[in-house]
């Protein structure tokens, strides 16, 4: 397949799956296996980081009005009942720290030992079952229908649950934070919005850290990666993936925010279960 067409295709996959609760990591790995992609460890790692960054950067653009509102109302919030500690911006930082510290320690200890197809398929399957149960049992029964009404305890809980996605590839950061939000008493829309906001610091920091490691020719576990030789062809490939991922992710976020207000997450849970079973069956037959 033409390299530029492949970059566009993978950009579409990343843009479609980064913010849906289906695991972008798993889908990129599936594409890598099915399409027999061999770009070299170094360039593949860099390309994955760049298209992920493209998807992430659509969030500040899409939520620019909401972000401006939060900064303008700090520290009391739009309700006027907040302190600096309970403001949505602070809660986002608290949740991020509750993820960042343990996730960094776990990935240092575990490295890439859990990045197997079996683990990924199992995480997709189990995550789908959990999401289905949570969405059915807690379908918009929560009292927290806005980020402005969140508590410190909810932020800590969601941040800690997000660690699962860092440790077990295939879990999905979106799935873990959305389900945690619903379990803590948030409505679907509120849980989804906080998941999006939390992903901004989480994924920007994680992506920058991964990029730094890649530029130093190291993977997450510290193992050596091949040296990436960047020429015009390589830069164009990265640019295509980045731009396509950004555009697709922007429209996915807009669609998902509308979808969740009238529908639930069960269709995504079913999809995860089906894909998880298929991945496990394929892995066991190899």
From Swiss-Prot:
The keyword Transport does not apply. Its EC number is 3.6.1.27. Its main location: membrane. It is an enzyme of class 3 (hydrolase). GO terms for biological process: cell wall organization; peptidoglycan biosynthetic process; regulation of cell shape; response to antibiotic. One of its GO terms (molecular function) is undecaprenyl-diphosphatase activity. It is a multi-pass membrane protein. It is found in: Cell inner membrane. Keywords: Antibiotic resistance, Cell inner membrane, Cell membrane, Cell shape, Cell wall biogenesis/degradation, Hydrolase, Membrane, Peptidoglycan synthesis, Transmembrane, Transmembrane helix. GO terms for cellular component: plasma membrane. The chain crosses the membrane at residues 43-63, 91-111, 118-138, 150-170, 189-209, 236-256, 264-284. It comes from the Bacteria. Disulfide bonds: none annotated. It catalyses: di-trans,octa-cis-undecaprenyl diphosphate + H2O = di-trans,octa-cis-undecaprenyl phosphate + phosphate + H(+). It holds the Pfam family BacA. Bacitracin is thought to be involved in the inhibition of peptidoglycan synthesis by sequestering undecaprenyl diphosphate, thereby reducing the pool of lipid carrier available. Belongs to the UppP family. This is Undecaprenyl-diphosphatase. It comes from Koribacter versatilis (strain Ellin345).
